[in-house]
Regions:
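Outer-membrane beta-barrel proteins and related beta-barrel translocases across Gram-negative bacteria
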Residues: 1-200
Length: 200
């Protein structure tokens, strides 16, 4: 494993091998060689006043069935936060676009698979922090509304909603998945700061 970061760039490369001890009389070794990541963050957008970031990933595997799979992903993100001085509303605006190319090579057969997928999305998180402060603590109650516009795709199933991801822009994990379809997330965030350095 090797990684290096400099200012707003990050690069890493790694290779791994896994032995599956529970498999008998068949291939036990699975390989990742290599996985490469190259990211660029905090690129100033002088036209619209936002920030741009780029994330690039490449993965190459040898699987237990002796097939070879590869995945290349490139994603561009744009973000800009606006605060209304008149109303106090906070607008966290984001746009994302990811392109993924994946392939599976079944050696000695004609069943090879090749897929190219596009995942565009536009979203905004509207919030209105309400703050109450007294001698013992400070409390913040924030109503949140998140309209998200994304096309439906055939690669990602329905995503479970829980307290950890209710305000997530994309609940799907993995480079070849993206939460599908237009949606609206809404709810409240509550934060309690007690003067004895206890936060809830």
């Amino acid at each position: 494993y090797f990684e290096r970061s400099h200012e707003n760039t990050f690069f890493s490369i790694e290779s791994n091998a896994y032995k599956h001890l529970t498999r008998q009389n068949s291939e036990q070794w699975e390989y990742l060689y290599p996985q490469i990541n190259y990211d660029i963050n905090n690129i100033k957008d002088h036209d619209f006043g936002g920030n741009v970031s780029l994330f690039n990933d490449f993965q190459n595997y040898k699987n237990l069935d002796n097939s070879y799979s590869s995945l290349a992903s490139s994603q561009i993100n744009w973000s800009k936060t606006n605060v209304s001085k008149n109303t106090g509303l906070i607008f966290d605006n984001r746009a994302n676009f990811r392109i993924v190319s994946s392939s599976i090579d079944f050696k000695g057969t004609e069943k090879d698979e090749n897929t190219i997928a596009f995942y565009p999305q536009i979203a905004s998180k509207l919030s209105f922090p309400l703050i109450k402060i007294n001698k013992e603590n400070s409390q913040t109650l924030t109503p949140v509304l998140m309209p998200i516009l994304a096309p439906y795709n055939n690669y990602t199933g329905p995503q479970a909603v829980n307290t950890g991801n209710i305000f997530s822009y994309n609940r799907a994990t993995g480079l070849n998945n993206w939460e599908s379809g237009p949606r609206i997330n809404y709810g409240f965030e509550w934060f309690l700061d007690i003067k004895d350095n206890l936060d809830i």
